[in-house]
Structure formats: structure tokens, C-alpha cells
Amino acid sequence: MKAKFKVLIPEPKSKFIRIKCPNCGNEQTVFSHATFPVRCLSCGTQLVYPRGGKAKIVGETVRILG
């Protein structure tokens, strides 16, 4: 008998990221490949700038989810 090959399942490169606002310290979850600018819910500072592919994150990354 021949050994079966392991079936590879592709995984997405994008993730959800928990970031902290540099001005007020508020934490919120954003998408790593965001297509729209994301603002802080407390102070309104822009935290994520869309860049065509992966978004530019201004705040401090606290945790990567998933």
C-alpha cells in the first residue's frame, strides 16, 4: 500500500488584530487588510490607513487574533 499524501488546506494571510490607541489607550479590534480608514472609538484618532493590500497600523499591536 502507498502512503496517503497529507491534504494541505490553504489559510488566509489576513488576521484580526487587537490594537491600542497611542493617544487615549483604548483597545479595539481591527482587520489587518482593512480597505477603509479605522478611527478610535473614544478619541477619533485614525488608527489604520488602507494601503491597497495590508493596512498600515499606527497604534500599538497588543495581540493577534486567529
Swiss-Prot record:
Gene3D superfamilies: Zn-binding ribosomal proteins (2.20.25.100). Keywords: Metal-binding, Ribonucleoprotein, Ribosomal protein, Zinc, Zinc-finger. Binds 1 zinc ion per subunit. Transmembrane segments: none annotated. One of its GO terms (molecular function) is zinc ion binding. GO terms for cellular component: ribonucleoprotein complex; ribosome. One of its GO terms (biological process) is translation. It comes from the Archaea. This is Small ribosomal subunit protein eS27. It comes from Sulfurisphaera tokodaii (strain DSM 16993 / JCM 10545 / NBRC 100140 / 7) (Sulfolobus tokodaii). The lineage of its organism: Archaea, Thermoproteota, Thermoprotei, Sulfolobales, Sulfolobaceae. The gene is rps27e.
